[in-house]
Amino acid sequence: MRLAVLDQSTVLTGRTPAESIRETLDLARHCEALGYSRYWLAEHHNSDAVAGAAPEVLMAAIAATTTRIRIGSAGIMLPHYSALKVAEQFRVLEAIAPGRIDMGLGRAPGSDGLTAHALNPNAATAADNVPALVRDLLAWVSGAPLVERHPFRDIRAQPEGPTVPEAWGLGSSNYGAQVAAHFGLPYCFAHFITDGLGCAEAIAMYRDLYKPSERHPAPYVSVCVWALAAESEDEAERLYSSRALWRLSRDRGVFVPTPSPEEAAAHPWTDAERARAEKLRARAIVGTGAQVAERLTALALEVGADEVAVLSTAHDPRARRASYRLIAEAAGLAHERVAIAAE
């Protein structure tokens, strides 16, 4: 099974957001050594929960300290930006790391409404115009001409080069699936946002509506899943308590730093909170490396995914690194890494 990584640069209680950014850089090198195929960075703004506000900047830093792993955005929230500027950013990234850049594109704001307005006063209108933004961006990134009579048809995105980034469509609903299918792009469903609700439907719609493109003659699907592995089931459950408490806040619309297991244990849980946490746990992929890898493989088969991207969070960065290691080992990625090194 091909595995990738999504990193949101999660903020932890007792640590600064700046430390979370530096931990992202460390984790990228760690995951490359483990044999993961891609390392994707999220985009969120004005958030106390996640620090990753500029994936394109983090991508450049990771490109400078890695050699094999593909590096991508998951995603660039396109309504905030000019399609030309995004094309230029990703052409620069492609020049830095040729053949290793993924350009994941999303429509969601990754923020509250006021912050989205601060980023782009016309964000609401731009969100309704995403297909046109994607059309222009793909043309500028690939060097293809814009549509006839386009006012910017004579503008080229620089720097041009022999390779171009690989564009991806991202989403957690049928809308993103339709956009990806229309433009002939690989598609990644954000399973971790919906706890899997709508996943199979969106992927089936994507495959049914897919229009082959020159670069991608056939559909290709990834599913991004939250998962956590530890050396024992008991330790995995202890670490998961942080996620459970954080999710209770998120479900109320309050985005806070990830608490520690000790903070979760000390929390005065109400009956309603415990009931909600039990429902969340029933859907969560948590356990030993072998248990998690088995669940991920089963999920990929169930929804028809070609690969799985793993979002793993823990209050202790060492536990998060261990989670990715245990999953990689159980999935056989270490053997793939040795084979790559031998080549």
Regions found by a protein language model. Name each.
Residues 1-69, 340-342:
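N-terminal beta1-alpha1-beta2 module of alpha/beta enzyme domains
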Residues 2-19, 79-145, 195:
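Flexible, glycine-rich active-site loops centered on histidine and acidic residues
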Residues 3, 31, 35, 43, ...:
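Conserved, mostly hydrophobic/aromatic
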Residues 3-7, 39-41, 71-74, 101-105, ...:
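Hydrophobic faces of well-ordered beta-strands that scaffold small-molecule active sites
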Residues 7-22, 76-84, 161-171, 230, ...:
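Active-site mouth loops of central-metabolism enzymes
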Residues 32, 59-68, 94-100, 179-182, ...:
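Acidic (Asp/Glu)-rich catalytic clusters
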Residues 123-156, 197-305, 335-343:
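An alpha-helical appendage that flanks or caps ligand/catalytic pockets
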Residues 173-197, 202:
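A conserved active-site cap/scaffold subdomain adjacent to cofactor or substrate pockets
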